[in-house]
A protein has these predicted regions:
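Soluble catalytic regions of membrane-associated enzymes that act on cell-envelope
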Residues: 129-298, 321-322, 326-340
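Long, non-transmembrane cytosolic or organellar matrix-exposed soluble domains/tails
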Residues: 257-437
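Juxtamembrane "helix-exit" motif on the non-cytosolic side of transmembrane helices
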Residues: 26-36, 94-95, 117-125
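Transmembrane-helix signature of polytopic, membrane-embedded enzymes
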Residues: 95-114
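Aromatic-anchored segments of alpha-helical transmembrane domains
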Residues: 19-24, 111-120
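Transmembrane-helix motifs of polytopic, lipid-linked glycan transferases
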Residues: 81-99
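Start-transfer (signal-anchor) and selected internal transmembrane alpha helices
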Residues: 1-20
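Membrane-interface coil-to-helix junctions
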Residues: 23-66, 70-75
Length: 437
């Protein structure tokens, strides 16, 4: 008992460090990512001299030094725990130096660390805005490529923001199940796939740049990334954005611009190895074309300047026409036309693509074509093979609507009806009718 009494301060400090570590690594892991991508610490003398020329610059230097470690979850959490304990121990040391070190004061020395964590690490917007917290979480999950976690979160707690819907559909696309499973999740029209950057919050631009990049819309990905770069406060730089801008210019063959971003990144702790590797082969067309990631992106990128803002379906169609093996772009093209309720185009695209990409036509596409054919061509044979259960469910859905005269009949709001394309179609048509004067 006496030994425990003598050790209680050390045990309390250890428990505090563990608590900070766990908080950062789990509930606040996405927030660490948010901070990391808004700063860029460089290990070179020029950066040090530049930042330390003013008090504000020195503060930014220290904040960026801490934030760089957030790139790796456990390392960032460990640094936060060490800093929190260091501050607490410094305060206790000061109290001892001025001879105010009664044991009952020891727990109070943790208060400054707790307050600093709460007010400096957790932004006010994160504390106040539920939608901002959702956006921060989805952005981190996309960056970390945690597709199953995105889908689990979206299924159990349907997204309240468009950013959440983009990320959900992107996760389905990266798993190769977008056209099979998209209507198991919340959908909100074609904007749930890609959207005009001028209508986005800055945080959403990180994720939408990732989505455009993987599809092959390299120029759009670059525009979104550059928009983030311009919107960062206080002239901050972002390692994530600098890497994306280097990547887009590398894929497009703009080596002079790519080199500029890589030169900055090569003096960073966690982006440096990547930058030095690609600086060494920059300009070597054969090496880049043979690169597993960037060579593949070159084959599926749009050859002409894409205009995502004005005609998404045309851009996606062009991507597929230029590279018929670009399945992600084909998935997005079919999903976009389904969400836009353009069933004639869905049928045309499917007939053109099914031999190369869809020997087994995905579930949602079968549902949309089956219903379209039942309504528009009741006496003609189906243009593609339709599964028996899919056809029966679709026919039953449309029959109930015809009998009740209500597209949103409550009896249809149960599985399997509410997980089909036609449930989305009915809801979308209902919204269109409400919008009409």
């Amino acid at each position: 008992m006496k030994k425990l009494k003598a050790m209680w301060k050390g045990l309390l400090t250890m428990a505090f460090a563990i608590a900070v570590f766990i908080l950062c690594l789990f509930p606040y892991r996405a927030l660490m990512n948010y901070h990391e991508q808004r700063h860029l610490f460089r290990w070179d003398s020029y950066y040090f001299q530049e930042q330390c020329a003013s008090l504000d610059g020195l503060c930014e230097y220290l904040i960026s030094w801490i934030a760089q470690f957030f790139y790796i979850g456990w390392l960032g959490a460990a640094v936060m725990a060490l800093l929190a304990v260091a501050l607490q121990q410094a305060i206790w040391t000061i109290l001892k130096l001025i001879r105010i070190h009664r044991s009952w004061l020891y727990p109070l020395t943790f208060i400054p660390s707790i307050l600093l964590f709460y007010y400096a690490f957790i932004p006010q917007e994160y504390k106040d805005d539920r939608l901002f917290r959702e956006a921060v979480t989805y952005d981190y999950l996309v960056r970390a490529q945690k597709w199953n976690k995105i889908l689990g979160k979206s299924y159990n707690h349907p997204p309240e923001t468009m950013n959440g819907i983009w990320c959900t559909n992107f996760a389905l696309g990266m798993r190769g199940t977008l056209l099979d499973d998209m209507f198991f999740y919340k959908q909100d029209g074609p904007d749930g796939l890609l959207m005009d950057a001028t209508r986005m919050q800055p945080l959403a631009l990180y994720s939408i740049s990732d989505i455009a990049f993987e599809i092959g819309m390299i120029n759009s990905a670059e525009r979104f990334a550059f928009d983030v770069k311009q919107r960062l406060p206080n002239n901050h730089k972002s390692g994530r954005i600098y890497q994306r801008l280097a990547e887009t210019n590398l894929v497009n063959g703009h080596y002079k611009i790519a080199r500029k971003y890589m030169h900055v990144l090569q003096s960073t702790l966690f982006y440096g190895r990547w930058a030095r590797h690609y600086l060494a082969i920059l300009g070597d067309e054969q090496a880049i074309n043979n690169d597993a990631r960037y060579g593949a992106l070159r084959t599926r990128r749009q050859q002409s300047n894409d205009q995502l803002i004005y005609a998404q379906d045309q851009v996606l169609a062009q991507l597929v026409a230029e590279n018929p093996k670009n399945k992600l772009a084909a998935d997005y093209l079919l999903a976009y036309t389904m969400l836009r309720l353009d069933l004639e185009s869905v049928t045309e695209h499917t007939l053109r693509l099914k031999d190369n990409l869809y020997p087994n036509v995905p579930k949602s596409v079968q549902e949309s074509i089956a219903g379209y054919w039942i309504m528009k061509h009741p006496n003609d044979s189906l243009p593609i093979p339709i599964g028996k259960s899919i056809y029966q469910t679709t026919a039953s859905y449309l029959s109930i609507i015809n009998q009740s005269g209500n597209m949103l009949d409550p009896s249809l709001d149960v599985p399997p009806y509410n997980q089909s394309y036609w449930h989305y179609h009915a809801q979308a048509m209902g919204k269109l009718k409400q919008q009409r004067p």
